[in-house]
Amino acid sequence: MDCCASRGCSVPTGPATTICSSDKSCRCGVCLPSTCPHTVWLLEPTCCDNCPPPCHIPQPCVPTCFLLNSCQPTPGLETLNLTTFTQPCCEPCLPRGC
């Protein structure tokens, strides 16, 4: 299956909810500290459906699709200093001034 296909996110089963930007279809989500034990600098792309992620995105870049846990609060997210970049799924993430 071509994971770079232009499709909207599928919502995974379980207590997680996939939230996408309204202006773009996105295939992968990112686990934020509220759902994963990783620090904000170690976020990894996680595919929304059953195929490998299309690319390995280095941080601090994050895709426009976030995987958030709807059953738990998100403490401290307002204090995180994140810079996001909108980009096609399959192009390498090249942040400027991060």
Swiss-Prot record:
InterPro entries: Keratin_matx (IPR007659). GO terms for molecular function: structural molecule activity. It comes from the Eukaryota. Keywords: Keratin, Repeat. Interacts with hair keratins. Belongs to the KRTAP type 3 family. This is Keratin-associated protein 3-3. It comes from Homo sapiens. The gene is KRTAP3-3.
